Amino acid sequence: MKEYVSPAPDAPSVVLYGRTAARMDEVVRLVRDLGGVSAYGAFTEEELFARIATVPRLRVVLFGGGIDAASRARARAHLAAHAPDVTVSEPGFGYPYSDANIAADLRARLAAAPPSGPTPPR
């Protein structure tokens, strides 16, 4: 599973930026199980940047462990320029890596972050 769209009409969204399909599936399911949250996966920078531009109510981008430092830096720069209200979760870097810690960090970020997403057309 690469994506889960919550049936809740105002569900916040998380973009998962990773390299491994099996782990992406596990983390999408973890986000789904938080309840009332949508999850969208991205395997490449291009896909990540497209998700940042189009995902509704984007609140958090989660970097997987396989994302190298240079790609993380480019992603952070893109977020700063295009979605400055979106926060970054970095399991294994910002906090100890475990599903329980990922869920706890996402819950905290989703509770604290303002809604964000693509700018509506004018």
Segments from the language model and where they lie:
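Conserved phosphotransfer microenvironments
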Residues: F63-L79
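Ser/Thr/Gly-rich flexible loops in soluble cytosolic domains mediating phosphotransfer, phosphorylation
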Residues: A81-R122
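Short hydrophobic/Thr-rich beta-strand motif most characteristic of the beta2 strand and flanking loop
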Residues: V37-T44
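Conserved acidic segment of CheY-like receiver
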Residues: A11-A21, V61
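Short, charged/polar "capping" segments at the starts of alpha-helices
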Residues: A22-E26, A70-S71
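Short acidic/histidine-rich motifs immediately flanking catalytic phosphotransfer sites
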Residues: V55-V60
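Short alpha-helical segment
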Residues: E47-F49
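N-terminal, charge-rich interaction modules
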Residues: M1-S13, H82
